[in-house]
Curated annotation (Swiss-Prot):
Entry EC no(s): 7.1.1.-
Name of the featured protein: NAD(P)H-quinone oxidoreductase subunit 5, chloroplastic
Gene: ndhF
Subunit (UniProt): NDH is composed of at least 16 different subunits, 5 of which are encoded in the nucleus.
Superkingdom in the source lineage: Eukaryota
Amino acid sequence: GLLLFPTATKKLRRMWAFPSILLLSIVMIFSTXLSIQQINSSSIYQYVWSWTXDNDFSLEFGYLIDPLTSIMSMLXTTVGIMVLIYSDNYMAHDQGYLIFFAYMSFFSTSMLGLVTSSNLIQIYIFWELVGMCSYLLIGFWFTRPSAANACQKAFVTNRVGDFGLLLGILGFYWITGSFEFQDLFEIFNNLIYNNQVNSPFVTLCAALLFAGAVAKSAQFPLHVWLPDAMEGPTPISALIHAATMVAAGIFLVARLLPLFIVIPYIMNFISLIGIITVLLGATLALAQKDIKRGLAYSTMSQLXYMMLALGMGSYRSALFHLITHAYSKALLFLGSGSVIHSMETIVGYSPDKSQNMVLMGGLRKHVPITKTSFLLGTLSLCGIPPLACFWSKDEILNESWLYSPIFAIIAWATAGLTAFYMFRIYLLTFEGHLNVHFQNYSGNQNASLYSISLWGKGCSKRINKNFLLLKMNNNESSSFFSKNTYRSDENVRKRNRGRPFINIVDFYNQKSFSYPYESDNTMLFPLLVLVLFTLFVGILGIPFNQEGRDLDILSKWLAPSINLLHQKSEDSTDWYEFLKNAIFSVSIASFGIFLASXLYKPIYSSFKNFDLINLFVKTGPKRSRWDKIINILYXWSYXRAYIDTFYTTSXTGAIRGLAQLTDFFDRRVIDGITNGVGVMSFFV
C-alpha cells in the first residue's frame, strides 16, 4: 500500500485541475454571451453599489460591461483555459502542482476583476492582485536563485509604476471628486471645455497614470523585468504575455483614453514611448539564445505597436492587435514549452540547456505538430497573410503615416526586423540537425561537434578537422556570424592567416544518441485550438463593409466605445490603398525572412548559399568597419542595450551605498554616542 500511495495521490491531485478548467469555461460562456449581445445591441451595462457612504465621500463597487470588458474577458478566459489544459501535463511531475493551479486560477480571477472594474479604486485593487500573482508565479521555482531574483525584479519594477498609478488616481480624484469612470470622464471634459483646470498639474497626473501602464506592459524604460520573468514555468509565460499581466497596461490606457485624448501632450508622450519600445524590443531580440527570452522581447515590441496605436488615437487598431497578438503569442509560448519539454528528455532538467537554441535544431523531424504550429505562429507575427496579425499590424502601420512619417518609417522597418528575428528563432530551433548531439556541453573529450559559428551557435576550441570556407582576412574584429568569445584554435588561425567565415567542425563518436519526442495530447490539443484562432481570428477586423453590407464585426462590437471617443468609423475601405500597403508590408516581412534564411539556414545541409553569401562578404577595410558595426549591434542586443547594467550601477548601487552608510551611521555614530555616555557615566 505504501508503494502505491504516491501514484494514487498523483492521480488524485490531477483531478483538481478539472474544477479550475470547468469554472473558467463557465466564465467563458458568459463572456461569449455578453459579447454577442453587445455586437447585436451596442449596449453598455453598469451596476454599482455603495461600499462606504458619508456626507462628503462615498465609495462604490460594481462592474462595467462594455466592449473593452467583453474583449478582455474573452481573451483571458479562452487563453486561460488553453493554458490550464496545457499545464495539466506540463506540471504533472512537479511537486507544486496543486499550488500552481491555485495561483493560476487566482491570476485569472484577478484579471477578470480588473477588466470588469467600474472605478479607479477597484482597478487599483485588482491591479495589485495581478502583480502579486505574477510575483508568485515568476518565482514559482524559488529554490533556483535566478527565479527568486527574477520575481523580486518584477515586483520592484512594477512597484515603481504602481506608485505612479496611485498618485495619478489621487490627483484626478482631487480634480474631479470622483473615482467612477463615467463621472470622471464627464466632469473632466466639462472642466477642460470651460478651461477650469491647471494644465501642468493635469498633464502630470495623466503621466503618473500612464506610468502604471508602462511598468505593467513592459514599456521603455520599465521593461527590464520582462525577459527575466521567463524564469517561471512556460505556461505562466504564455498567460502573462498573451492575456493577463502585460495586457493589463494596454487595457488601462484604452480604458482611460477618453481622459487622455483631451490632453494632447500625453497622447504624444504615449506614442513616443510606444515607438521607442517597438524598436528597442526588436533590436534586443536579435541575438538572444534563450528561446523564451527571444519571444519575451518580441512581446515587448508588439505591445509597443499597441501603445503607439493608442497614442495615435487609433482605439480600434490597438484592440485588434491585442486580440490577434494574444492568440499568436500564446501559441508560440506553448509551442516553445513543448520544445523545452522534448529537449529535457536529452539534457535533463536544466533551463540553461533545454531553453538554449544553441543546442536545438532539426526538431521538425521529431516534433512535427509542434513545428507546424510554431511556424504558423511565427508567420502570423511576421505579418504574412491571411494569418491574424497581418490584418491588425497592417492597420497600425498604415495609420502611422498619417500621424508621423518618422514614426511610420521606424514602425515599418521594425516590421522587417520582426520577421528576421522570429524566423531566426524558428530556424535555429527546428531546421538543420540536432546540435545537442554535436556540442561538447557535458565536458566529454569524445563528444561530437558539428557546428557553425553564427549568432546563437558556438564553435569548439578543440578542432580535429577544420574545413575553411569563405576565408577572410584575420582582423581582430569578428564577423557577423561569430562573436569573439567563440574562437577557433589560435594556431589554426595563424597558420591559415585568416578566419573562416563559416567553420564546420566534425568529431567522430561511437556513442548512440537519444532523441526528443512529441508532447502528449493534453499539450498538443491547446496548440491545435490556438492554431485555429491564429488562422481565423483576423476575420473579426477585416473591413468587409461594401455595398451596404456591414460585415466588420469588430467595428460593430466597439461601436459604443468609439462613439464615447467621438470618433467616426470609415464607411468604406479603399481596397486599392489597402492592397498597395499590404504588398509593401508583406515585401518588407519577406525580405526579413529571406535575410534570416540566408544567414541562419543550416549551411551544412545546403551549400548553395555560399555563392549568395560571397556576394555580401568582401575582405578589406570596408569589411573591417562592417564587422565593427555588427559587433556593436550584437553587444547592444545580447547585453540588453546595457540598460540593466545602468540600473544595477546607478539605482541598485546607490541604494546599497545608502544602506551601508545608514548602517555605518547607526552602528558607529548612534551606538557610539550611547556607548560613550555609558562609559563616561562609569568614570563619573
